[in-house]
């Protein structure tokens, strides 16, 4: 969420960014999507942990509603950097990641959205164990090479 919020801040400051590289970002102010309900318990990122993170990151309801915390609620995302978004299919955050990708696309922002099937939040750290993590590493690296005109 911080990286996505900073992309809007960079746009406002006139600082061109090459890419938003977002790996299972939290983009919403509330845990009210179907994926939050479906994956609230039993996997890596559970609802109590998300509530704990929210409670330790934002001090007030106003801060929680602020689009810089929850970029899905930004008034506009026109002109922000293109985005590569990697999501885990079995993650409470998957729906808000898809929603953020849709918001960017509706604003004309180029988006490459990858949903890695059958994996959970934190899968990107498991490159030695699961092929989806290795694929995500390769996909993210390729997105960076393209953004920096190295390919």
Where are these regions (language model features)?
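Alpha/beta-hydrolase superfamily serine-hydrolase fold, recognizing
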Residues: 1-151
